[in-house]
């Protein structure tokens, strides 16, 4: 997968560069894509900076609270924690791609491979953990709640998700390199046919979008039906959260995967022979994948901050921090009269 606007997942040959999405050596006329590169130099660094700041703040808060304050965790807590970790690692690759868009790849061949693989691992694992959360919410609402806490199966599922994502990143580790134009791009041996390239593209779409989406859609649909039938409970807030989660997933992920699928079809049948159309496809992949990765910034809001208990806990932490600041000021003013006033930490649930 990797960042396709900086390094296409179509696995083009050596003569391709950063934003080229087709090997135009097969055509009589060379397609010059200077406008696409200029757009990338402006759009990508600006968008990545915004995504990095917002995503780092939200996901770091989630990880810190789960790691240091909430010791007793449910299955959903474990999935959300893994999701936040995946989102953080994904966000940490963005500064490298921002520099790559402007100055080219300056960190060498090994870092090109590692950064590309990290992007794929955490993008794919994030989508899978979203599916895990929906499955757990389905079981929590429609079946009898488990009394055993997290349990071994939950950790096995997390392990399998990470392993699957790592396996999907193998093409990045093997084929990504720095070309003669200082771009971190995939360079495949010539004997690998278009069917192999398209197969990898389709596999990424299936694992990174179709499978998680189908799981989420089915689980949340059944969960919503069950909630509606339940008497004497407040239904508006849970249903609103379910609806928001599904809509945000569709809005952020569907456009990118549609463009990605069009690329895969073009790899097989070479449908795009017009230079202007190829440029529009390149810009489309830049914009849609940026929107797709922005989902990592929204996950803390959708899965954590919308929970009343979590918001209450944040308020308690803020009050405790304010009390600590006032105490520090009193210590500086009247050090011999200071006391260590503490407040017990309470747990919360999603």
Curated annotation (Swiss-Prot):
It is found in: Early endosome; Recycling endosome; Cell membrane. Residues 1-41, 100-113, 176-199, 266-283 are extracellular. Keywords: Cell membrane, Disulfide bond, Endosome, G-protein coupled receptor, Glycoprotein, Membrane, Phosphoprotein, Receptor, Transducer, Transmembrane, Transmembrane helix. GO terms for biological process: calcium-mediated signaling; cell chemotaxis; immune response; positive regulation of cytosolic calcium ion concentration. It is a multi-pass membrane protein. GO terms for cellular component: early endosome; external side of plasma membrane; recycling endosome. Glycans are attached at residues 6, 19. Expressed in circumvallate and fungiform papillae, olfactory epithelium and lung. Lower expression in liver, kidney and tongue epithelium bearing no taste papillae. Very low expression in the cerebral cortex of the brain. Residues 67-79, 136-153, 223-241, 307-350 are cytoplasmic. It holds the Pfam family 7tm_1. This is Atypical chemokine receptor 4. Belongs to the G-protein coupled receptor 1 family. Atypical chemokine receptor subfamily. SUPFAM superfamilies: Family A G protein-coupled receptor-like (SSF81321). The gene is ACKR4. Atypical chemokine receptor that controls chemokine levels and localization via high-affinity chemokine binding that is uncoupled from classic ligand-driven signal transduction cascades, resulting instead in chemokine sequestration, degradation, or transcytosis. Also known as interceptor (internalizing receptor) or chemokine-scavenging receptor or chemokine decoy receptor. Acts as a receptor for chemokines CCL2, CCL8, CCL13, CCL19, CCL21 and CCL25. Disulfide bonds join 112-184.
């Amino acid at each position: 997968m990797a960042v396709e606007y900086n390094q296409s997942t179509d696995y083009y040959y050596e003569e391709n560069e950063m934003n080229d999405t087709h090997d135009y050596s097969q055509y009589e006329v060379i397609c010059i894509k200077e406008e696409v590169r200029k757009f990338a130099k402006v759009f990508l660094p600006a968008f990545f900076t915004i995504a990095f700041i917002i995503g780092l703040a939200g996901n770091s808060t989630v990880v810190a609270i789960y790691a240091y304050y909430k010791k007793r965790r449910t299955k959903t807590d474990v999935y959300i924690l893994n999701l936040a970790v995946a989102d953080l690692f994904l966000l940490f690759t963005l500064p490298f791609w921002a520099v790559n868009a402007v100055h080219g790849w300056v960190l060498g061949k090994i870092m090109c491979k590692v950064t590309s693989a990290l992007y794929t691992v955490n993008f794919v694992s994030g989508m899978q953990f979203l599916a895990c959360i929906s499955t757990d919410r389905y079981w929590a609402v429609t079946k009898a709640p488990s009394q055993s806490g997290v349990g071994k199966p939950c950790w096995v599922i997390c392990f399998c998700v990470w392993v699957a994502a790592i396996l999907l990143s193998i093409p990045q580790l093997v084929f990504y390199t720095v070309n003669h134009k200082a771009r971190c791009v995939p360079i495949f041996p010539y004997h690998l046919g278009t069917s192999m390239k398209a197969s990898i593209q389709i596999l990424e779409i299936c694992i990174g979008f179709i499978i998680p989406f189908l799981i989420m859609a089915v689980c949340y649909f059944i969960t919503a039906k069950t909630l509606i039938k339940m008497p004497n409970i407040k239904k508006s807030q849970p249903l609103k959260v379910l609806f928001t989660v599904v809509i945000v997933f569709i809005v952020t992920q569907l456009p990118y995967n549609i463009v990605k699928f069009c690329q895969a079809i073009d790899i097989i049948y070479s449908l795009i022979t017009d230079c202007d159309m190829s440029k529009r496809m390149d810009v489309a992949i830049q914009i849609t994948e940026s929107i797709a990765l922005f989902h990592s910034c929204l996950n803390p809001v959708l899965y954590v901050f919308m929970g009343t208990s979590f918001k209450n806990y944040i308020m308690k932490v803020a009050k405790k921090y304010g009390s600590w600041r006032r105490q520090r000021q009193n210590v500086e003013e009247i050090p011999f009269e200071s006391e260590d006033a503490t407040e017990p930490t309470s747990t919360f649930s999603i």
